[in-house]
């Protein structure tokens, strides 16, 4: 029997699992509806006999008779043929049920007292049954119905506790019919003397039973079947019991299925508070296993024991306590499940939205994600609207002449889009979800973005509701202007008013003919009016002509100019494209910047000419306009007209102010386009187009007057002069000089209004450099070692860079190849080498420091401005050349002060890794180390000379096109001359201490090797740069003196440096190879110090030569060599006296 019970339990578990997979919401609703309709089909279960023992309960009572028990058990068994044992009935009648409270809504369930005879309960206490593992069931046929005895053996604790178990029963037979039993309530009251009671009940196996649990909203969940375990309890007294169903009035119908194989309970709970009854009984000895369903519902079952025989139930005495209200558990309803699905779906979409908007690595809460998504959508809508506007403007601008005749492009664009904007705003407000948080604004513009201020074009509150342009401010096309000028000229030339007046006088004379016949005496008949009759028609004619001409001027220069209101939609469109042009210039996208600037001009009503006829008309009109603006009478008349217009302003700001503002904006746009054309950033156009843009910028800038700063006005005139100089060449060179002088006159008498970045043009050297056309503006300028990179789209900045390099080259050339100047007596005298070089370097330093001080005419972010701050690269070269000149002059203090600047090499030069920069740097360090006052100065200086010599040789071997070849040559020659002079000075310091006059100190092998290497670099440089020849003979004689070679050849080389030449006997190009004054003085000093006395023609010749060398060195400024020469003169004075005696 135990095996069969276990087999039935296993089958029930399998069927329950299958039921959980197959049940749906409709099936369970039909089941509950079917159960609720069983009251009419089974009236015996709800008879008054069952409810008689519950006084006052109304509809909820219980029965104590055996008939109710028999009927319920028969209904429960269905088709079972088993009969109820009479002993069971007799023992059941001894149970008395107390009356229940009439309140069905009470939180405490009604109590039931079960009395057990004390004689039937053994006194020996029993331990809690041990749950044994379940054995493997044997397969048995399911067609045979078996009877099993189920024993429920609870163990009670010493503390009295009350537990109420409400378990309505559902029995399902093979024919799938349901029978409903009323809920039964069993109250077990225990005490310390109560012993374990074994309740054994015989039930019949029912096929295909399922255990279901109904939640508050009707969702059914499948529960796993309870495990049936067989517990052996041989000492427990068994009493046959027939369970009597009871009826209580509660909020819900609790259904319980009992089965002989120990299948679990199916409870349909409507009130969630009753789910606490499914928790395990909290006793000390009762162990109740817990089962967890698939939906997380916790169920409890009691351990059962399979008995052999039926035993009666003993009455258990004890008191009844009120039950505690069940604790409210976690709500597990279908509504929560559906909400959980919705939340999961919403969370997935929010995560996907976050990945699209902010990326996968961003961390932000849901409201922040939604807010950012809304902002991004608004941004996309705004960008879409902007692109739509720009597309429409460009389409209208491409139409050549049809839309340019008296039509404002900005007004057309805005009027066509107004209706679309209103519809789109309504759609956006309808589609927009509510605010993501309480802090969001209730009303917002559909185009506003939280991260940036809204554009006036997209915010109706910021754009004034006023007409874009009245008909008088639309402007005229240049062809119409030229046509009006031609008609006016023809009217004044042919003067039809004169003919009309003459025709009127003739008509009056015809009306009064001479009547009568006869002869008349010839005589002079004087008119009655006199001279007034002759003057009146002339005055009237000139007055009418003057009115006509003035009207034409007012129409062309005042009413013909397009004017844009400051807060109109056209103005906003213009500024949007202007700012976009600035951004394009900052990125280096010059084509896009030019497109935006052309769109700006089209919005202002000043589109660029697209055909040759339009270009000719525009150029002619600008020439006429510039000529008219120079007439004071015309300017005075225009001012009076503006004052009259100011009395009745069309807008609040006044027509004159708006006209000047529009002229300023157009002038700056023309100026930027002109700069891009000059620098070659745009496709090359015709020279007339460049002249047209230059004249437009100049005319409109002069019309703007105080609206445009003086520095910008000067820059516009200089750019116009530069454009005429580069594109027109010598044909219109006089116009370039005119605009340059005009720019200088705008700076004021003391150049107070000129910006620092343009101050170099006010210097005579700057003017000469600008007008001699020794510069060129390139589209892609190469990087230079001598100046920092200037703005590639600013032609003035490029010319300034070329001027700075020209000054640096002049400063170095004055050291390595000084130029001769002619005096009044046709005698040539070389200028002072060091003074000229220092003057150039001083000018260069002042012009370099003034770079970029001017304020840009456009926004501060524009790239069309000079680099802010001084040119640190050019400043470093200035300091390096100053150190070289100071060392050659013997000014040790100046060398130390400027060497601190040379030590800080700019990063731009360090990145280039140029060997020439390293050579000049180590040469400066060698000169600084050779100064007196240092312990190891000579050795350190020699080491730096070696490094500089190696870098110089590397720079001569570098092949490739350089940006400044002439400047590279002079710097290489200067570096080589400095190294050779420094080596010579170190050798002479070693020899001057102990050697007498006329004797030579021989240098070491390392010194000679280094000198030979530098001399080889000088010879190599002389092949490509002829001025290096003037240094070759002197240094060759020096190395022979250091090595102690034959003095004959040394004397010849020195004689070559001392020889004077005239310009008549030389050819072109040989003048650069002549030695300078400093070379001649150095040669005299070497000959008098190191050559033997026999090589001089007379004993006094050495003193004469030294005196001449001293004068030359003093004139040049070489104080160190001059001091040495004077010391030798003093020594030679005593020696000469001795030799003469």
UniProtKB/Swiss-Prot annotation:
Pfam families (alphabetical):
HLH
Mutating residue 485 to A has which effect?
A: No effect on cleavage by S2P
| Result of changing residue 479 to A | No effect on cleavage by S2P
**Alphabetized GO MF terms:** DNA-binding transcription factor activity, RNA polymerase II-specific; DNA-binding transcription repressor activity, RNA polymerase II-specific; E-box binding; protein dimerization activity; RNA polymerase II cis-regulatory region sequence-specific DNA binding; sequence-specific double-stranded DNA binding
Q: Which PROSITE patterns match?
A: BHLH
Q: Which UniProt keywords apply?
A: Activator, Cholesterol metabolism, Cytoplasmic vesicle, DNA-binding, Endoplasmic reticulum, Golgi apparatus, Isopeptide bond, Lipid metabolism, Membrane, Nucleus, Phosphoprotein, Steroid metabolism, Sterol metabolism, Transcription, Transcription regulation, Transmembrane, Transmembrane helix, Ubl conjugation
**Where exactly are the transmembrane stretches of this chain?**
480-500, 534-554
Q: Which segments does the topology annotation call Cytoplasmic?
A: 1-479, 555-1139
How is the activity of this chain controlled? Activation by cleavage is down-regulated upon activation of SIRT3-dependent PRKAA1/AMPK-alpha signaling cascade which leads to inhibition of ATP-consuming lipogenesis to restore cellular energy balance.
**What family is reported?**
Belongs to the SREBP family.
Instruction: Spell out the SMART domains in the cross-references.
Output: HLH
Positions of post-translational Phosphoserine modification: 855, 1098
Q: What is the effect of changing residue 478 to A?
A: No effect on proteolytic processing in response to low sterol
Intervals, Lumenal compartment: 501-533
User: Matching SUPFAM superfamilies, A to Z?
Assistant: HLH, helix-loop-helix DNA-binding domain
What is this protein's record name? Sterol regulatory element-binding protein 2
